[in-house]
Amino acid sequence: MVERHTAEYTRRRVLGTALGAAAGAYGLTQGLTGTPQVWAAPDFKLRAPEPNAKRGGVLRYGILSAPAHFDIHQSGTVSNMGTQGAMYDNLIRRNPLDSGQTIIPDLAQSWEIAPDSKTYTFFLRKGVQFHDGGKLTADDIKATFSRIIWPPQGFSSPRTPLFSAVSAINVRDDYTVEFQLHEARPQNFMLGAFASGWNVIVRKKTLEEHNYNLRQVMDYPGTGP
């Protein structure tokens, strides 16, 4: 029997993005070490959106050091995630409200895991657009993860080892993408890998326009708030 996962999705999460990135880093470390840890849930509540909120303006954000470059996929530091994270979405993400102990939908509204744990199928939300107006499709998911899993020459991908079992990425239709594994991995490990805060989804067209290297590209479009 195929295992299917789905949950309610909310866009009110600019604060949650930063917390989710930290939770994602924690989750992957936990999965690699195999040592169970318990974190207390943060004592905070997200504010309800203002009914007549002002659009535009400038957000100033203080960090300890400037990012060495702007390519999140080639980064492993919070300096990139803290400044860029809110501009992008992930396929799935860790829930910032429980310190990342659960996985929740992001661009994927639901997913299925085959009984043998060797096929992961993600079903995307429809109507999502990049900041430049381009429509999000499964081709963008494939292009993003192909770059992370099988990096081109000269590309540094810190999270490639997490996906060593992935043998193929198949686009079934505009809103369905499938990851095939040549051998099973623990489901919580694989879902944690997909949910890493640095695995943001980038438009395929953007990658092609910049020869799959975004280190010096400051403002490539995302789908985040």
Predicted regions and their residues:
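Short, well-ordered beta-strand elements
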Residues: 56-65, 119-121, 178
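N-terminal lobe/hinge region of extracytoplasmic solute-binding protein
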Residues: 44, 62-115, 146, 223-225
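N-terminal secretory signal peptides
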Residues: 1-13, 22, 32, 36-37
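Aromatic- and charge-enriched surface segment that lines or borders ligand/interaction sites
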Residues: 110-154, 172, 178-183, 188-189
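Short, solvent-exposed loop/turn and secondary-structure capping segments
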Residues: 71-74, 134, 189-193
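C-terminal segment of N-terminal export signals and the immediately downstream linker at the start
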Residues: 30-60
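Surface-exposed binding/hinge segments that line
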Residues: 159-219
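Extracytoplasmic/secreted proteins, especially bacterial periplasmic and envelope-associated proteins
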Residues: 86, 106, 136, 140-144, ...
